[in-house]
From Swiss-Prot:
Database matches in SUPFAM superfamilies: HesB-like domain
Cellular component aspect of the GO annotation: cytoplasm
Superkingdom, taxonomy of origin: Bacteria
PANTHER family: IRON-SULFUR ASSEMBLY PROTEIN ISCA, CHLOROPLASTIC
Disulfide-bonded cysteines: none
Protein name, UniProt field: Uncharacterized protein SufA
Native source species: Bacillus subtilis (strain 168)
Lineage of source species: Bacteria, Bacillati, Bacillota, Bacilli, Bacillales
Consequences of knocking out this gene: Not essential for growth on minimal medium.
Molecular function as annotated in GO: 2 iron, 2 sulfur cluster binding
Family that this chain belongs to: Belongs to the HesB/IscA family.
NCBIfam families: iron-sulfur cluster assembly accessory protein
GO terms, biological process: iron-sulfur cluster assembly
Residues of the signal peptide: none
C-alpha cells in the first residue's frame, strides 16, 4: 500500500530545517484536517512527540509522518510540497479529493465531507 500523503523532497528539506531550528529533531510530523474555514475543512501540520494507536504512520525522506484516522480518507493522495518564489516560500498542498476551496485558499471541502464552514 502506498503512503496516503506524499511529502516531496523539497518539503522534507524545509521540514527538517524547521525541526532543527525548533529543536524538534526527534519529533513526528503530524498532518491532518479539521473542521473550519469558510469552505468547511482546513489543514493542520505540526510536530508531536507521541502517536496514537489509530494513526497511520509512515516515513518519507527521513521524516516520520502521522495522519489521524479521521483525516486519512480526506487526505488520501495528497502531495505536500515547498515552493520558493521571489515573494518568499511556503508549503503547498495538492489534495485530489478537494472539490472546492474558498477565495483566500485556506479551506476546502470534498464531495463526501463539507466540514464545518465558518464565516471569513
Amino acid at each position: 500500500m502506498s503512503n496516503p500523503v506524499t511529502i516531496t523532497e523539497a518539503a522534507a528539506l524545509h521540514i527538517k530545517d524547521m525541526m532543527k531550528e525548533h529543536e524538534e529533531e526527534n519529533a513526528f510530523l503530524r498532518v491532518g484536517v479539521k473542521g473550519g474555514g469558510c469552505s468547511g475543512l482546513s489543514y493542520g501540520m505540526g510536530f508531536e512527540h507521541e502517536k496514537s494507536e489509530s494513526d497511520s504512520v509512515f516515513d518519507q525522506h527521513g521524516i516520520t509522518v502521522l495522519v489521524d484516522k479521521e483525516s486519512l480518507d480526506i487526505m488520501n493522495g495528497t502531495v505536500i510540497d515547498y515552493k520558493q518564489s521571489m515573494l518568499g516560500g511556503g508549503f503547498t498542498i495538492d489534495n485530489p479529493n478537494a472539490i472546492a476551496s474558498c477565495g483566500c485558499g485556506s479551506s476546502f471541502r470534498t464531495a463526501t465531507n463539507a466540514g464545518k464552514p465558518e464565516e471569513c
